[in-house]
Amino acid sequence: MNDIANLCELVGADVNMVRKGIGTDSRIGSKFLYSGCGYGGSCFPKDVKALIHTAAKFGYDMRVLNSVEEVNEKQKNILFEKFKNYYKGDLKGRKVAVWGLAFKPETDDMREAPALVLIKSLLNEGCFISVYDPVAMEECKRRIGDVVTYSQNMYDAVIEADAIFHVTEWKEFRMPSWGVIKKAMKDDPVLIDGRNVFSAADLEGITYLKIG
């Protein structure tokens, strides 16, 4: 679905409409047809790699799974690329907020999490980063130390920020007070939504960038 989302951006289509259309086919369904900023965790990446490796041992090229892995690694960079394109490469010194660190909600697991890829890219460009996750803060400290600022909550993270990255779809992030958030941020703020859960119409004038 991520490839479809990226194509939608190029041709001017809305991936959410495409997803709904595909999902009406009972042979497919709509439950897992969501684009995003990549998968992580301990199971799915390991299982895909194991299948590719096992097939290679027996001389078989798992072309579909190789493509899945390639697309996923590319997708983990998509939020940063949107940010870079939005500011036309002028990133040094910008402050950003990262909402969500774990690879999925309801866990502190950050193994192969998209947030780690994003944070590394932002640091390389000289950005100042405030992060917040309901349960993964200690795990993040263990992994990357004090190279980012650890915020008390989602509102604290956005103070004086140029941009927000929504990386993990925690329920806590779903219905914030956008008016409060906009006032706390710098002029012309932007939200880059890695899970496509928000609507531009609700954001009180915050620029909205989604996937697809």
Annotate the PLM regions.
Residues 1-212:
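Structural/interface elements that position substrates and couple domains in central-metabolism enzymes
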